[in-house]
Structure formats: C-alpha cells, structure tokens
Amino acid sequence: MNQDDFRKLLATPKAETSQLKNFSSNKSQRLVFGRKHKTAKLEAPRALIKRKQLSHSTSSDITRHSNAKNSGKDTQFYEEPSSKQDIELHKLHEKLRNGQITTKEYSEKSKELGGDLNTTHLVRGLDRKLLEKVRSNELALDDSLLSSSEKEVDEEADKLLEKVAEESSHPESVSILEEKKKIPLYPNGQPKYRKILENGKKVKYLLDENGEILKRLVKKEKKLKNDNERLENEHRTEKLNVNANSLGKSFVKHDIPLPPVDLKLDIFEEVGEYDPFHENDKEPAELKAKDAFQLKGHHELDAPYHKKVFDTNQYSDLKPTNFMSQIHRLAKVQERKEEEERKKGKDGQIVDAGFGLVLSKDDTADIHELGESDDDDNVKRRKTKG
C-alpha cells in the first residue's frame, strides 16, 4: 500500500457510516423479555466525528499541495487573503523574494499600507512626519536654552580632550588618568589635577576651573642606603621626633648623667645580722657590751693578735667590727651539731623490746651471739632416750 492509497482511504468515510447503520439496526431489532426496550439514539461516537473532520481537512490540504507542485511554485501553503491590505502585503513579500525590492523599501511600504502619512495618526500607527517636526523643534529649543558660559565650557573640554590625545601619541608622556581612584572635579566638570609620566617620572599638574595649570609637582625618587647603621639611626630618630613634629618643635636627645654612687656605703647597716638560731638572746651580757663597744670604734688595750693586724694594716677600714662574736657563734653551732649526732647514734642503739622494756644494742647483741646452752643439749638427749 502506498501513501496515495492510504490518503484515498482517509478521504472516503462511507464504509464507516454503513457499518454504523448496520450496527444500530441490529441493536434495535433485539428484544428483551419482560420489559420494554428503550429506543436507541442513532448517533455516532465522538471519536468517529473527529476522524471525519480530520479526513476532510487532510483531503483539502492534499489537493492544495498537489496543485502547487503542478504549477511549479513553492510548496508552502498560504491562506486566502481576507482584505486588500493583506493582498498587498502578500505581493510585497513575493517581490522581496524575487529580488525586485530591497528590505528598506519593503519596510517603508508595509508601514504605508495602514493609510496615507497625513492620516495614519488617526487610523493606525504614528505620523512620522509630525514626529520629525517635533524632534527638530526640540533640538532648536535645546540650542537656544544653552547659555554662552556652558558653550565655552564644552569648547574647553573639547580642547582638553584634543591635548590628551596628542600627549598619548608620544611614548614619553603617558597619561595616568585611568587609576582606581576617581579624580575630583569642579562644579563645571573640569578635573582638579592631571597626572602624566615624563621621562619615567610621575608629574602632577594642578588645574583651575578653566583648565589652566597652576602648579607642576614632580615626585622625587628616594635613594636607598646600604649602611645598616644609618637605617637604624633613622628609625630611632623617627620614633623620637613623632611628638616633636606634632608640636612643631625640634627635639634634641640629651645624655643624662647618672648620680654618683658611694661604694663604701653599707646598705645593710640598719638591718642587723642574720641570726637563724636566735643565739644572740643566750649570749652573755658581757659579749654584747663588747660588740657594742667595738661598733663605736673603740678598741680594748689587750686586743688579740688579729685585731692588731687590722689596726696596723692599710685596709683597716675594711676590718670586721664583730669578728669575735662571729667566731663564738660558729663554735656554738659546731657544738650543737656534734650533740645532735651523738643523740642520733644513741637512738640507733636503743631497741624497743615491748612491754615497756628498752634494751641497748649491746644487750641484744649478747642474746644473738650466744649459742645453744648445755641445758638445751641435756633436754634433747632425754627426749631421744624416752
């Protein structure tokens, strides 16, 4: 079966209607015993009605396509135009396809199809001539409203732009206007300064409101110093001159001398002597009186040999005034240590035997050193005999 045969089948719906009639007649002839049969409505289902509509539409489309092929025209389907405007638009479209009209002519003529240009604002679209007149009037009004001062400002701005373009053409002077920070402007729109590179150096020009140069500022390059000592000194002076710069005064560093120190001065003169064992309380009153007498600078007539040595020596000022008292103390400390060692030795020899008995080491040694007595031997013999 070809496509043409299939289309013919779709175009002939008579077989379906005949089948429906036979189907409905068979249903009507049937009888049901015991009750009345309702008369069946002879209506086709919705699906069959839709099929009929589709078959009619496809058949009409097929005929149109076949006519287009036979005529040699494009196979594209066009609906029948409903008005004169649509017919003219269709003709314009065909002319544009054939290359008889350009796209501009096509757009202009399609706009004119709504009516004459004099009456389009009343019917459809806009009056383009009227718009052109209004725009021309607005431009004339803008020119008249502009004051003479504003015109001068615009002219100066144009001149500055020309200068910048000339400078950018030279490789030595490159403008640095394109920076992250925005350049401040005057109320009339003029920049307050301008930056330019000249011979590898940044140059800043301060400008007036009229764009005239007031000052020319050049940024100097700092020379690096290799000496570490100079850099350290500069760092110190910067720290010292922070307060001086804020007050507007020059600060000078002065070397302040330290006060003189008396090396002979005894800083522990009023504190007294260190006495951990509190021996001064037990000393006799005579020794204390002698120490006090020596502190005052007096010496006994029958002084010992070591005192005479200090008196005759050239370093007599450094002699200890309480030399004897120190010797007595050291002797007492030594005696106490010896007594404590003796007590510890005695404590080690004593043994607690229990029941309040305390035995010395000598007694316990005798007990352990003794061997078995004769009585013990006799007892063992008796046991063996018995």
Swiss-Prot record:
Keywords, alphabetical: Cell cycle, Meiosis, Nucleus
InterPro entries per record: Red-like, RED_N
Gene Ontology cellular component list: nucleus
Disordered: annotated span: 1-28, 46-85, 366-386
Bilayer-crossing regions: none
Function: Required for meiotic chromosome segregation.
Protein name: Meiotic chromosome segregation protein C1539.02
Organism of origin: Schizosaccharomyces pombe (strain 972 / ATCC 24843) (Fission yeast)
